[in-house]
């Protein structure tokens, strides 16, 4: 019987399953190499951890790893029901909160190695967590995509740790009771982007769509479609970073000014940025709450031992 020790949390409603031990040892010299090794040689562990019958489509996984940098607290690899993520803002907040829950870290600044570079996270005395994300930028502005059944939609392409297509004018009602319509609309948009060869820089696939609307209690409300056809319950850390990059490029948000980003569930992240050459360094603040400390069991006689 194989065992996987996990800590479950949620950040603004979006769950993170942190794997503390039980996965195969990885040997890559960088987190990107270790992610590729996990994907190519040990992907069944991701499936066992996140897919039914132990998981669900909404879960985001985070594998706790030894750091590859001398000054880092740890390394991390993020994954979901469909595959692997470059970076995850809500997951980083969940990671830090979980490590505090386990007594492994104290308030202060903690550097974390990820497949797309090192980020830092500040655990504040009151439990809030601020992630200094990877340098972010807008790649293209006002890009047209023809979405079957919906016509031409325009959006910006931006990097915030993942590639996003950000749409402000869409004619959709961003409310929780409209989530099924929003899911089908944004999924059709993702498929249209792929079919029409619209990508991030150097041909990188765009795997997130972010819609925006007004919110009476925040600067904006969003709906974020993630790879795997699950919507983000949180305001999305990498998505908020991509939004900050667009606001900075438009000159509509000053350096250091706070942007309050609400999600479709009503949870909020507070974001700001600093200039970093031609890019920006986003700072995303939120909170995570623990939901479980448990052991997943894998019985290899189980026909669904490695997921459905």
UniProtKB/Swiss-Prot annotation:
Binding site for substrate: 89-90, 208, 232, 237-238
Enzyme Commission number(s) of this protein: 5.1.1.8
One family name in Pfam for this protein: Pro_racemase
Keywords assigned: Isomerase
Keyword Isomerase (UniProt): yes
Catalytic reaction(s) noted: trans-4-hydroxy-L-proline = cis-4-hydroxy-D-proline
Catalytic residues (UniProt): 88 (proton acceptor), 236 (proton donor)
Claim: Isomerase is one of the keywords in the record: yes
Source superkingdom: Bacteria
SUPFAM superfamilies: Diaminopimelate epimerase-like (SSF54506)
Example of a GO MF term: 4-hydroxyproline epimerase activity
Chain segments annotated as transmembrane: none
Purpose of the protein: Catalyzes the epimerization of trans-4-hydroxy-L-proline (t4LHyp) to cis-4-hydroxy-D-proline (c4DHyp). Is likely involved in a degradation pathway that converts t4LHyp to alpha-ketoglutarate. Can also catalyze the epimerization of trans-3-hydroxy-L-proline (t3LHyp) to cis-3-hydroxy-D-proline (c3DHyp), albeit with 200-fold lower efficiency.
PANTHER family: TRANS-3-HYDROXY-L-PROLINE DEHYDRATASE
Family listed: Belongs to the proline racemase family.
Name of protein: 4-hydroxyproline 2-epimerase
Lineage, uppermost ranks: Bacteria, Pseudomonadati, Pseudomonadota, Gammaproteobacteria, Pseudomonadales
């Amino acid at each position: 019987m194989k065992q996987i020790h996990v800590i479950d949390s949620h950040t603004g409603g979006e769950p993170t399953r942190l794997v503390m031990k039980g996965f195969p040892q990885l040997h890559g010299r960088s987190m990107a190499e270790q992610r590729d090794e996990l994907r190519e040689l040990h992907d069944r562990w991701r499936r066992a951890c996140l897919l039914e019958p132990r998981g669900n489509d909404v879960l985001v996984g985070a594998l706790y790893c030894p750091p590859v940098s001398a000054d880092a607290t740890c390394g991390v690899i993020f994954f979901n029901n469909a595959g692997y993520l470059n970076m995850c803002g809500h997951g980083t907040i969940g990671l830090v909160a979980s490590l505090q829950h386990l007594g492994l870290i104290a308030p202060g600044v903690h550097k974390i190695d990820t497949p797309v570079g090192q980020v830092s996270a500040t655990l504040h005395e009151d439990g809030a967590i601020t992630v200094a994300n990877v340098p972010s930028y807008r790649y293209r502005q006002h890009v047209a995509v023809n979405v079957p059944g919906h016509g031409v939609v325009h959006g910006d392409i931006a990097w915030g740790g993942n590639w996003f297509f950000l749409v402000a004018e869409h004619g959709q009602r961003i409310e929780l009771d409209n989530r099924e319509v929003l899911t089908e609309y944004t999924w059709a948009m993702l498929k249209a982007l792929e079919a029409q060869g619209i990508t991030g820089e150097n041909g990188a696939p765009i795997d997130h769509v972010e819609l925006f609307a007004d919110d009476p209690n925040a600067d904006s409300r969003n709906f974020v479609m993630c790879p795997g056809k699950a919507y983000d319950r949180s305001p999305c850390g990498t998505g908020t970073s991509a939004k900050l990059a667009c606001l900075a490029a438009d000159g509509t948000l000053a350096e250091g000014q706070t942007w309050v980003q609400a999600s479709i569930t009503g949870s909020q992240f507070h974001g700001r940025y600093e200039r970093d050459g031609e890019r920006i360094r986003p700072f995303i603040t939120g909170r995570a709450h623990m939901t479980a400390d448990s052991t997943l069991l894998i019985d290899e006689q189980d026909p669904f031992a490695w997921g459905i």
